[in-house]
Amino acid sequence: MKKVTIRDFIKKKSTKEKITMLTAYDYPTAKIISNTGLDSILVGDSLGMVVLGYPNTLNVTMRDMISHTRAVARANPPQLIVADMPFLSYEIDTKSAVKNAGLLVKAGSDAIKLEGGEEMKDTVKAIVKAGIPVMGHIGLTPQRFLRLGGFRTIGKTKQEEDQLIKDSLELEDAGVFSLVIENTYVDIAKRITEKLNIPTICIGAGPYCDGQVLVINDLLGLSEFTPYFAKSYVNLKEIISNAINQYIIDVKNNKFPEKQHYKERES
């Protein structure tokens, strides 16, 4: 599989070929993904919740994102690597936003993703001007859950719906190459997808986007809580628990290690 680029994303929209994206946070997971036909890896700030055990993404730092981006990049996957910009790494001023985006690219990402709508237009323009591809993210933006009043579906009111559409158009105009739409109503996501020339990637926004993204822990059945819009394709938590319990039994009953697991001196 050849390296996926942002040009491939744009092409897939025109050919109506769905884009597939999953999160990954470490080398072994990225190595497994590298041998699949997945289009893109998102090194998401969701790692704060599913890897580091935080209640939300607000505690994730640039150091965290750089470290995990490097781990994923070391697997040398052909997938497009997109790294999330964590909370307060891009909101303060455009100069620090460009610098932090550059640090993620130096760590191995092919593009960065940031949350927010029209208020992020100047920031997006500055990062793109620096030569760094930007993926937008609207709808439920987890870094802004306090302002939104919690984790909820966005677009219930006409005002919210109009703002989502305006945000999407402003971000496209600012230069994002694609747009994540999270946890909004299916008809809104469909309207946005039809209006934009760039591909949309849905998570909890229905089947009419140009692609889908999931947190890999949800897909593998590893999450403590799986949101309604996610699908588990395997119960890896149960498989891992069973393996650990079997190991305990084998050790206690002297069934592990067996002869093939150690060396004896030759007499």
UniProtKB/Swiss-Prot annotation:
It catalyses: 3-methyl-2-oxobutanoate + (6R)-5,10-methylene-5,6,7,8-tetrahydrofolate + H2O = 2-dehydropantoate + (6S)-5,6,7,8-tetrahydrofolate. Binds 1 Mg(2+) ion per subunit. GO terms for biological process: coenzyme A biosynthetic process; pantothenate biosynthetic process. Gene3D superfamilies: Phosphoenolpyruvate-binding domains. Pfam families: Pantoate_transf (PF02548). Catalyzes the reversible reaction in which hydroxymethyl group from 5,10-methylenetetrahydrofolate is transferred onto alpha-ketoisovalerate to form ketopantoate. This is 3-methyl-2-oxobutanoate hydroxymethyltransferase.
